Amino acid sequence: MGAASHPPVPLLNPAAPNAQVLDRLWSTILARKAADPLVSHSARLLSRGVNKVAQKFGEESVECLIEAVAGNRTALIAESADVLYHLLVMWVAAGVRPEDVWLELQRREGISGITEKASRPMLLSIAETRKIP
């Protein structure tokens, strides 16, 4: 049964901030790219290049995983915000716009995850991966 056959689950608080906050955050990060790295955390991260930004994203992701496994909901929420922020910094560093990702998510909507994953070409084998210096 595909995702399209399930009714949407209503939000508990529809007035709460939504995914548009990610678009605004991305715009802020993009604007700060040209800022002084001594004044802006985003500018400092971006000045280090995509490899270091990706490494920082990985570190934040692991912290998020640890809190999920530990069952610490409050810390998981905080770490999730960190992960989303660092993901957006990585997008800016790599030249990815949010709408690129939203379009890909829209393309996948209603397709079984197993079917969608099987349709992807093998982009990188495990043997080709390398540690970021």
Swiss-Prot record:
Q: List GO BP terms, alphabetically.
A: L-histidine biosynthetic process
Q: Does the keyword ATP-binding apply?
A: yes
User: Cellular component GO terms, alphabetically?
Assistant: cytoplasm
Record's CDD domains? NTP-PPase_HisIE_like
Pathway membership: Amino-acid biosynthesis; L-histidine biosynthesis; L-histidine from 5-phospho-alpha-D-ribose 1-diphosphate: step 2/9
Query: A single GO molecular function, which one?
Result: phosphoribosyl-ATP diphosphatase activity
Which catalytic reaction applies to this protein?
Answer: 1-(5-phospho-beta-D-ribosyl)-ATP + H2O = 1-(5-phospho-beta-D-ribosyl)-5'-AMP + diphosphate + H(+)
Enzyme Commission number? 3.6.1.31
Ordered alphabetically, the record's keywords are: Amino-acid biosynthesis, ATP-binding, Cytoplasm, Histidine biosynthesis, Hydrolase, Nucleotide-binding
Question: Where in the cell is the protein located?
Answer: Cytoplasm
Q: Membrane spanning segments where?
A: none
Recorded hits in PANTHER family, A to Z, give: HISTIDINE BIOSYNTHESIS BIFUNCTIONAL PROTEIN, HISTIDINE BIOSYNTHESIS BIFUNCTIONAL PROTEIN HIS7
NCBIfam families hit by this protein: histidine_hisI, PRK00400.1-5
User: What is this protein's record name?
Assistant: Phosphoribosyl-ATP pyrophosphatase
